[in-house]
Amino acid sequence: MGGVTAYFDLDGTLLDSSSEKTLTGLLSKRRPWRIPLGAMMWSLGFIGNLLRGRSIYDAARNRGHLAMSNWETLRRYSEELVETKLSKKVSLEALERLDWHKQQDHRLVLVTATVMPMAQAMADYLGMDAVYGCGPKNMTGILSGSERGWSVPRRKGKVPIVQADAKSVD
């Protein structure tokens, strides 16, 4: 690598779509029984976040809709969506920018608040050297809907992640 790292966000930057909404849509389509469960868990998370003093915006950004999902299922669906839908939603400009950085021998890093299985699938497709997405260190079993202990915490932002990555590369 040339000593330069280029950091990218996913949704709205490289991808002209919401990867996590697309994943949630497929999950609901394939497992419709999850809709009332996901709605209830999201609502409970929203109310709980409001009671803890979070803003309405932050309270609404919870992962209750993914509660009781299996990490392996999310991985499989994410890979399928990247192959069939999301790869077509990456703009030509984004692909050209990534290609330019690759030609310059820059290290490419994806830093996103998207759930980790989707972030990893997109990073693999885009040829990223590293990826930081939302998820616990050990992604096995069933999701609870809580983000406690997850990487790339939404409330603290991506800056600490980028700073830590930059220090680790130096």
Question: Language-model features: where?
Answer:
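Short, compositionally biased "basic patch" segments
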Residues: 45-71, 126, 130-135
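Exposed alpha-helical structural elements
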Residues: 22-23, 35-39, 61, 73, ...
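Metal-dependent phosphoesterase signature
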Residues: 57-93
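Acidic/polar active-site rim loop that often engages polyanionic ligands
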Residues: 20, 56-59, 141-146
